[in-house]
């Protein structure tokens, strides 16, 4: 069972993600929510999620900085990015930091579920089955400003 943390500054969207998705059918359980990257880092310490679903543009700390800090701390949780940014540069930066998927908002019915299903299939092919948590991801060398 994947433990999910939902990170989104807009409360209606965050609650919609938590309530509208049939997480149990996906083999997941939502263990926490956060309204910005800083709250997310604290929630990661508290809940040890194996999957983080996050927005990019948030106050206090954005999703890319949160992801960068997670990786610097050795946290290899899977990350799915949800954002209104349609910039290839943002997608590329998130993927370089180990994000496993990138969905543009507004996303359509079933898109998030499909992203989670793709992740679970990748995990099954890798022999993880979703029960052991994420395997370490190979990470590129990052320079300031990346």
What are these regions (language model features)?
Residues 58:
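Receiver (REC) domain active-site loop signature in two-component systems and cognate sites
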Residues 42, 64-75:
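Short amphipathic alpha-helix used as the core "switch/output" element in two-component signaling
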Residues 11-32, 46:
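Two-component/phosphorelay signaling modules centered on CheY-like receiver
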Residues 36-39, 62-65, 83:
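Acidic catalytic/metal-coordinating carboxylates
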Residues 8, 55:
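Active-site residues of response regulator receiver
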Residues 92-95, 99-146:
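Interdomain helical linkers/hinges and coiled-coil/dimerization scaffolds
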Residues 41, 65, 86-101:
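Alpha4 helix (beta4-alpha4-beta5 surface) of REC/receiver domains from two-component response regulators
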Residues 33-51:
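Acidic, metal-coordinating helix/loop segments flanking the phosphotransfer/catalytic sites
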């Amino acid at each position: 069972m994947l433990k999910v943390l939902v990170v989104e500054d807009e409360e209606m969207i965050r609650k919609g993600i938590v309530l509208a998705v049939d997480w149990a059918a996906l083999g997941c359980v939502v263990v926490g929510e956060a309204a910005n990257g800083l709250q997310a880092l604290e929630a990661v310490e508290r809940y040890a999620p194996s999957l983080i679903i996050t927005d990019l543009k948030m106050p206090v700390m954005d999703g890319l900085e949160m992801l960068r800090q997670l990786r610097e701390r050795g946290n290899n949780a899977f990350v799915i990015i949800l954002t209104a940014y349609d910039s290839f540069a943002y997608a590329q930066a998130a993927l370089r930091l180990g994000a496993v998927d990138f969905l543009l908002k507004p996303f359509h019915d079933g898109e998030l579920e499909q992203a989670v299903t793709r992740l679970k299939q990748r995990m099954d092919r890798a022999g993880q089955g979703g029960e052991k948590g994420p395997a370490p991801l190979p990470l590129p060398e990052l320079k300031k400003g990346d």
